[in-house]
Every structure is written in structure tokens, then in C-alpha cells.
């Protein structure tokens, strides 16, 4: 007697055929496989510390240490300032650091390399550690090529799937959007070199900063008045990606009321979600609105919170610059972390009408003034009719869409 041994699908390519709904392909992969394989978590009522909204969300870090690394005594991708149990060491001005920025000379070494060879970028150190078998990549396979049908997807057209919500796939731009997409009018502020950002893992040498809302007479945390919203995201971005691709994006009711620091920053992601999405407030907004209808928005704070591995979901967002219960740096197990300060869509209603939550370079959640300049990554929902064409979801083989 013979029995077939079921092998769960590893990627969307194994779980779905071209021409099927992208949303159903993702949920099918999650249901047919295991979260430990796919890094997709179904946030139903049985998921511990989850959102409880029946969404399917990707969570975890892109890079993980291998068995070879563990046997060598390296339990983490990054070493802490005073330890040697990580694969990669970071240095600023000749001193070993565990920071996110460096205004002086920076370099990286590999703990297992007795020659202490220096690498100029975090990306280069990662690539060598992967080649040498100490680190694996592509552990979260949620890359999508959007805005291009080229055989090799341009890096500026790479987006990532946050999850599936009410039958719609939610995307965020992988790297920060620059002037070619958002323009230099509206709430454009300045540009910054990426040289000083120790864990920046993108492809750009310069990142454009945008105000959240800098218009003199309406510089408040009211999203409907923001030119980052009305001009840079919902005019320039849509025009620059072209009609074909803009037509694949659904008009969405965004939750823009926000909440207090105590209710967003100083609580676990599940509570952040309730206070940001389910029960937002209108305190300190000027239009008394908790929703706004448009195609393009920015990430929610809770999106970022749940993008980390579940081991981090018992940590408050105010401590996402630290470690989870396993002593692993949370920013190394959160695929959404890119190493540069950036805006969320959610106002901070704690103090006045000028503050909004933002992600800091260290992976922590802070608040900033609406006339501060930070990076921006467009976020949007695809229409439920958008179809899967191919690809496994890795950076080199991103999911492609039927055009």
C-alpha cells in the first residue's frame, strides 16, 4: 500500500495558475500551505495577537541566518554593539555601533571573516554573507512588478504586498518614491543622500523628502488638506504611472482620524489596529473626518507593526527599535523596514493639529511635525479584478500581473 505525501506549496507560482485573481492566489497559497513556509498570516479570530479582521498579511524578515551560521555561534543577522553573536558588524568612525545613521565614515565586517575585510554598504555585506552560506534571502516572497511589463522588472517598479483585505491586494512601493513619480511641486521638501543610513537596503543614492502638509494657511494634520495627498500622490503619481496601471488601482476609503500616542505608539500592534482603524478619533483635525476617499495613501502604523514577525507582536510600537522576546532585532525581522525616516497616513491627536506618526530610521515609531520632510512610499489597493500572470514573489522573480 502506498500513500501520497502532501507537499505544501512554497510559492504563489506553485499554488496558482496564470489568469486567476491575484487576491485568491494569495489566500489560496496561505490556506494550502503553512505560515512558517509562506510568511502569510491569516488574521482571523484564532491568530494570537493578530488584527482579527480576517485579512491575510505578510510578516517576517527578508534575511535569516542559516544552520551553518547557528552552528558557528551567530544567531542573528546583525551583531549588537557589545556582542559578537551576529553575522554582520556595523562601524561608524571606526567604532562598532548598533545604530541606524552615521554622519562619519561607515563600513561593515563579517563576524566569521578573520581578515575583517571592510564593506562599504550594508547591501554588499549581506550579499557576501548570503554567498558564503551564513544568511538566506527572499524569505518573504511578496514582491510585485507594477507599472512595467519589462521582462526584467526595473527596481523602481518593485512593490510589495502588505496583504489581502476584503478581497483586494494592498501594495506598498518597495523603495521610496522620488520626483520622477511624486514630482517636485506640492509638498516636496528636499533630497537626502543615502550614504549615512546604515541599514538602507534600497537601490537609490538620493531620496526625496516630502512634507506631510506644509501649505502655510492649512499646515495641519488633516489629510484632506495635504498636498502630499492631493498633488504628489493622487495627481502626480497616478499621472506618472500611466492610465493602464492607474486603472488597476481601486478607490479606497482611508482611515485618517488617527489617535493619541498612548493609543497608537505605546500599545501592541493589535491594539494599535483597533485605535487606528476601528476606532479612530477626530481630535485636533480641522475637518472632523475619520475617512478620506482616494486611490493612493500611505501606510498605516498597524501595517508596519504586523509586517514584523509574530514574535514582535507582543512588543509595543514604541519599542520596535529594540528586540523581540528572542533577542532578535525587530527591524531585521520586519520586511517593511527600509532604514530611512518616512511618513504614515495617521495623525497624532495627542498634542496639537500639526503632528503625524512617522517611522524613524531606527525602526521605531515617532511623531513629526507636518512640515518636517521625510520619505514617502505610495500605498494602494488593487482592484479585485486584477489577475496573476506569473512570478514567485522574490525580488528577482516578482509577481507579474495580466496587463
Question: Where on the chain are the PLM-derived regions?
Answer:
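Long, domain-scale functional regions
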Residues: 1-403
Amino acid at each position: 500500500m502506498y500513500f501520497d505525501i502532501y507537499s505544501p506549496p512554497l510559492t504563489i507560482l506553485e499554488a496558482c495558475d496564470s489568469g486567476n485573481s491575484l487576491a485568491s492566489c494569495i489566500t489560496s497559497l496561505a490556506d494550502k500551505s503553512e505560515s512558517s513556509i509562506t510568511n502569510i498570516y491569516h488574521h482571523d479570530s484564532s491568530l494570537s495577537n493578530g488584527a482579527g479582521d480576517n485579512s491575510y498579511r505578510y510578516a517576517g524578515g527578508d534575511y535569516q541566518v542559516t544552520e551553518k551560521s547557528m552552528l558557528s555561534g551567530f544567531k542573528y543577522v546583525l551583531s549588537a554593539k557589545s556582542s559578537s553573536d551576529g553575522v554582520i558588524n556595523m562601524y561608524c568612525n571606526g567604532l562598532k555601533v548598533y545604530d541606524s545613521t552615521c554622519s562619519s565614515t561607515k563600513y561593515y565586517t563579517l563576524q566569521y571573516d578573520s581578515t575583517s575585510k571592510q564593506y562599504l554598504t550594508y547591501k554588499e555585506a549581506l550579499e557576501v554573507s548570503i554567498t558564503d552560506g551564513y544568511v538566506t534571502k527572499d524569505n518573504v516572497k511578496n514582491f510585485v512588478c507594477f507599472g512595467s511589463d519589462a521582462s526584467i522588472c526595473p527596481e523602481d517598479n518593485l512593490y510589495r504586498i502588505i496583504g489581502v483585505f476584503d478581497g483586494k491586494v494592498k501594495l506598498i512601493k518597495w523603495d521610496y518614491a522620488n520626483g520622477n513619480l511624486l514630482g517636485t511641486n506640492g509638498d516636496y521638501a528636499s533630497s537626502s543622500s543615502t550614504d549615512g543610513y546604515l541599514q538602507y537596503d534600497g537601490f537609490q543614492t538620493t531620496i526625496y523628502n516630502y512634507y506631510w502638509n506644509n501649505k502655510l494657511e492649512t499646515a495641519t494634520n488633516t489629510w484632506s488638506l495635504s498636498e502630499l495627498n492631493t498633488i504628489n500622490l493622487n495627481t502626480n503619481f497616478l499621472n506618472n504611472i500611466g492610465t493602464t496601471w492607474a486603472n488597476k488601482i481601486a478607490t479606497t476609503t482611508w482611515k485618517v482620524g488617527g489617535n493619541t500616542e498612548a493609543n497608537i505608539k505605546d500599545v501592541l500592534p493589535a491594539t494599535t489596529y483597533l485605535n487606528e482603524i476601528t476606532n479612530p478619533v477626530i481630535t485636533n483635525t480641522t475637518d472632523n473626518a475619520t475617512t478620506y476617499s482616494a486611490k493612493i495613501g500611505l501606510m498605516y502604523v498597524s501595517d508596519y507593526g504586523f509586517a514584523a514577525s509574530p514574535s514582535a507582536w507582543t512588543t509595543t510600537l514604541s519599542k520596535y527599535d529594540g528586540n523581540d522576546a528572542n533577542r532578535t532585532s525587530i527591524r531585521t525581522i520586519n520586511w517593511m523596514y527600509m532604514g530611512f525616516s518616512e511618513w504614515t497616513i495617521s495623525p497624532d491627536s495627542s498634542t496639537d493639529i500639526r503632528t503625524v506618526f512617522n517611522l524613524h530610521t531606527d525602526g521605531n515609531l515617532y511623531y513629526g511635525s507636518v512640515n518636517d520632510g521625510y520619505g514617502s512610499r505610495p500605498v494602494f489597493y488593487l482592484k479585485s479584478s486584477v489577475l496573476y500572470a506569473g512570478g514567485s514573489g522574490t525580488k528577482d522573480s516578482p509577481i507579474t500581473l495580466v496587463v
